[in-house]
Amino acid sequence: MKTSVLFAILGLALLFCLSFGVELEETGRECGGLMTRCDGKTTFCCSGMNCSPTWKWCVYAPGRR
């Protein structure tokens, strides 16, 4: 009984890690959020964000959509 509960918990943890990795891989190809590295040529920021020319990361830009 204890062993089966342990295997169930480990299985759920493994499933969570795999799904998180797949989701992270999918979002890696999209736009960058706050404090995400950008260069304005190949990597871009999401709406509401602007690529800072000084720091080369996405910063909040009020008024930009």
Curated annotation (Swiss-Prot):
Keywords attached to this entry: Amidation, Disulfide bond, Ion channel impairing toxin, Knottin, Secreted, Signal, Toxin
Entry comment describing in which tissues the protein is expressed: Expressed by the venom gland.
Protein family: Belongs to the neurotoxin 10 (Hwtx-1) family. 46 (Jztx-7/10/12) subfamily.
Main location: secreted
Membrane spanning residue stretches: none
Any one Gene Ontology molecular-function term assigned to this protein's record: ion channel inhibitor activity
Species, as recorded: Selenotypus plumipes (Australian featherleg tarantula)
GO cellular component, one term: extracellular region
SUPFAM superfamilies, A to Z: omega toxin-like
Comment text on domains: The presence of a 'disulfide through disulfide knot' structurally defines this protein as a knottin.
InterPro entries to which the protein is assigned, alphabetical: Huwentoxin-1, Huwentoxin_CS1
The protein, known as: Orally active insecticidal peptide-3
Prosequence residues removed at maturation: 22-29
Subcellular location: Secreted
Positions of modified residues (Proline amide): P62
Entry keyword annotation includes rRNA-binding: no
Signal peptide residues on this chain, from the entry's feature table: 1-21
Cystines in this chain: C31-C46, C38-C51, C45-C58
Coiled-coil residue windows: none
Function statement: Probable ion channel inhibitor. Shows insecticidal activity when injected into mealworms.
